């Protein structure tokens, strides 16, 4: 039975208890939100994971993608990237390999982590079609479903499945046109197949069969956003909104089956459109958890897109997005390496946390408040303890140690806090009344 069906029947599962403890919320609240579809807990019943809650009134979660490419196929590096992502604080992983032995890579990653792991099954179907017949346009619709089931059996916890691309969506995309085109890899595979074969999307037509599979293994559907813009000038266009309408309808059908859903959102979007997109998605999809990809809020900062994404992530979390896919410095340039992954997770976590603070400083800002007290008392040990990455903070100060232990080399004895502690705080509260 799925987490959602258990919740609908009034049962609090161990996964719900874990999420409640992590979020410091009542387990019954988590159950009610899972039953409504407002919170998802990706937790495949084929393997053990540490449960992570994604959705309303929870801390904004961060996903890190890993995976090989056709140019760089190094399983050891991908395992290192997964480990580094976890150490940096990623809440989930997505395994998106397109090069090498895809089954072995996926299964090895799953064996080496307790984090929830996501995938995009159409990648494997397309790769196999290309290897066999030379092009993704030769994909067999039966293979699309077979790969979904195979990956579900392996233990994948959430899947990005491109069910919402249909002929009407493509018609609107074609009529309107775009500066940046269509940049979803899975969306490009499905769209090219539809155009070449002059047929409806098999994943849309056979959505009930998709639901049969994911319900059996309690896989959370991450409803893929194939029509997301790849350039700021294309954001929030008719094709994207048309797909969102379809996504909302598919969410309804999934909930009727007790299948958990997350809805993916834009990747490239101006800051001023973020709130609008979140409001529309929450309305259309009846408060399903929203998974934003980045987002990228300016298109001209390659090599620093992790910073761009952190800015977007802060705005997304602030306005109610629930799940953010990280972006690394290698975005738009190359397959990310281990250090790129670390920088991407760090940047996105900072952005997501900043957005959470705008929603509820007291609840999400315990360490921020404690840090203020530690800084005022010049207690460096406590400052490290409340830092998001304590070792990094300590390493910088230790590299350039101050003469006075209670200061740093930025100000030394001219430290404003030290001066205030010595003089202003000792003054009588009524000293400045006259």
Curated annotation (Swiss-Prot):
SUPFAM superfamilies the UniProt entry points to: Class I glutamine amidotransferase-like
One GO MF term: zinc ion binding
Listed EC numbers: 4.1.99.17
Signal peptide (from-to): none
Main enzyme class: lyase
Pathway stated in the Swiss-Prot or TrEMBL entry: Cofactor biosynthesis; thiamine diphosphate biosynthesis
GO biological process: thiamine biosynthetic process; thiamine diphosphate biosynthetic process
Cofactor(s) named in the record: [4Fe-4S] cluster
Keywords: 4Fe-4S, Iron, Iron-sulfur, Lyase, Metal-binding, S-adenosyl-L-methionine, Thiamine biosynthesis, Zinc
Coiled-coil boundaries: none
Residues given in the record as substrate binding sites: 94, 123, 162, 184-186, 225-228, 264, 291
Gene3D superfamilies: Radical SAM ThiC family, central domain (3.20.20.540)
Chain residues that bind Zn(2+): 268, 332
Enzymatic reactions: 5-amino-1-(5-phospho-beta-D-ribosyl)imidazole + S-adenosyl-L-methionine = 4-amino-2-methyl-5-(phosphooxymethyl)pyrimidine + CO + 5'-deoxyadenosine + formate + L-methionine + 3 H(+)
A Pfam family reported for this protein in Swiss-Prot or TrEMBL: ThiC_Rad_SAM
Residues annotated to bind [4Fe-4S] cluster: 408, 411, 415
InterPro entries per the UniProt record, alphabetical: Class_I_gatase-like, ThiC, ThiC/Bza_core_dom, ThiC/BzaA/B
Cofactor binding comment, as recorded: Binds 1 [4Fe-4S] cluster per subunit. The cluster is coordinated with 3 cysteines and an exchangeable S-adenosyl-L-methionine.
Family of this protein: Belongs to the ThiC family.
Function per UniProt: Catalyzes the synthesis of the hydroxymethylpyrimidine phosphate (HMP-P) moiety of thiamine from aminoimidazole ribotide (AIR) in a radical S-adenosyl-L-methionine (SAM)-dependent reaction.
HAMAP family documented for this protein: ThiC (MF_00089)
Protein name: Phosphomethylpyrimidine synthase 2
Organism: Methanosphaera stadtmanae (strain ATCC 43021 / DSM 3091 / JCM 11832 / MCB-3)
Phylogenetic classification of the source organism: Archaea, Methanobacteriati, Methanobacteriota, Methanomada group, Methanobacteria
